[in-house]
């Protein structure tokens, strides 16, 4: 923890943004599915009851904020968690609440 008010404000803003994204249960479910594997939209859709269009919109938002990244193989796009801190946060949440 920092004592510098400017740094504290910046970090608090960053963390609040992450928590805001995680406050949507579908996005949280997506990240939980991606915690151990990279998956396609179709594979995610087998775990999460949501239209493929809505699922893609959530993935786009997570990607826009740097929480997931993609890897393309031919026409197939694989999603994975981009930030190791997000994986750590998910592990803590899972340990405490699941």
Language-model features and meaning:
Residues 1-10:
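Short, intrinsically disordered or compositionally biased N-terminal tails of bacterial proteins
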Residues 3, 15, 80-98:
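Conserved segment of winged-helix/HTH DNA-binding domains
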Residues 13-53, 73, 77-84:
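N-terminal helix-turn-helix DNA-binding core of bacterial DNA-binding proteins
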Residues 46, 63-64:
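Alpha-helical residues within the helix-turn-helix
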Residues 58:
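Residues within the DNA-recognition helix of helix-turn-helix
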């Amino acid at each position: 923890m920092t004592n510098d008010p400017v740094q504290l404000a910046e970090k608090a803003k960053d963390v609040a943004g992450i928590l805001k994204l995680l406050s949507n249960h579908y996005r949280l479910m997506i990240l939980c599915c991606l915690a151990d594997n990279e998956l396609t939209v179709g594979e995610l859709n087998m775990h999460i009851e949501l239209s493929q269009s809505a699922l893609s919109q959530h993935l786009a938002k997570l990607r826009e904020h740097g929480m997931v990244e993609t890897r393309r193989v031919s026409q197939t796009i694989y999603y994975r968690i981009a930030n190791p801190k997000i994986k750590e946060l998910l592990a803590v949440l899972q340990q405490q609440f699941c």
